[in-house]
Amino acid sequence: MGVTGMTYMFTMVFSLIVLILSSSTVGYDYFQFTQQYQPAVCNSNPTPCNDPTDKLFTVHGLWPSNRNGPDPEKCKTTALNSQKIGNMTAQLEIIWPNVLNRSDHVGFWEKEWIKHGTCGYPTIKDDMHYLQTVIRMYITQKQNVSAILSKAAIQPNGTNRPLVDIENAIRRGTNNTKPKFKCQKNTRTTTELVEVTLCSDRDLKKFINCPHGPPQGSRFSCPSSVQY
């Protein structure tokens, strides 16, 4: 084989290796830290919640996401090792409860880990690091939407209020970055604030503006005034 043939073969092999590596690497641009307001989740759910809710925003999930194109999901088949959760359980049950089924918190964490957490490498190392990261963000770093709103004297009293007031309060608590909102009509056809998402860069080092919310006109978009 001549030099030209060897060069061609080397190029083909190298290209194949690059293709294999790139196909096995899942990309993401940023993280969404989504929190759900427990009463609104239950009010908008077709099946009523069995247990009383706390008037708190608690964690829905931490999701690797993309500005353009689909968000990565289920990147590995690694299950959550519930035997290792140990002394994190008490904190997680408070800040990350399964609102719809409080008898199965672990099942909720595992669902979030498999669907989203497995796609967070290298920022998220493994299942326990995923849970530890959520605890750190919500408690240590005070990325707690209820606390942020309370600091701005916005309390969950079930009244309608301008969405811009809620946004401005959250901006003050997140270095003036834009959050994302999800709203939904409850059984009384009142539109409630169901979720607030705080966005961070792909290394979870700093807040960023959330790129986009639900499309205008969708059933999850928020009007100018919402109940909270």
Swiss-Prot record:
InterPro entries: Ribonuclease_T2_eukaryotic (IPR033697), RNase_T2-like (IPR001568), RNase_T2-like_sf (IPR036430), RNase_T2_His_AS_1 (IPR018188)
Catalytically driven reaction(s): a ribonucleotidyl-ribonucleotide-RNA + H2O = a 3'-end 3'-phospho-ribonucleotide-RNA + a 5'-end dephospho-ribonucleoside-RNA + H(+)
Glycosylation sites: N87, N101, N144, N157, N175
Record field: transmembrane: none
Gene3D superfamilies (UniProt xref): Ribonuclease T2-like
GO terms assigned for molecular function: ribonuclease T2 activity; RNA binding
Signal peptide residue numbers: 1-27
Taxonomic superkingdom: Eukaryota
Residues binding RNA: Q36, H60, N98, V99, F108, K111, E112, K115, H116
Modification note: N-linked core structure at Asn-87 and Asn-101 contains xylose and fucose or consists of disaccharide (GlcNAc-GlcNAc). N-linked core structure at Asn-144 contains xylose.
E.C. number(s) listed in UniProt: 4.6.1.19
GO biological process terms held by the UniProt record: RNA catabolic process
Disulfide-bonded cysteines: C42-C49, C75-C119, C183-C222, C199-C210
Enzyme class, first EC level, given as a word: lyase
A single Gene Ontology CC term: extracellular region
Keywords from the named record: Disulfide bond, Endonuclease, Glycoprotein, Hydrolase, Lyase, Nuclease, Signal
Function description: Self-incompatibility (SI) is the inherited ability of a flowering plant to prevent self-fertilization by discriminating between self and non-self pollen during pollination. In many species, self-incompatibility is controlled by the single, multiallelic locus S.
Similarity section: Belongs to the RNase T2 family.
Protein's name in the database: Ribonuclease S-1
Organism this protein belongs to: Pyrus pyrifolia
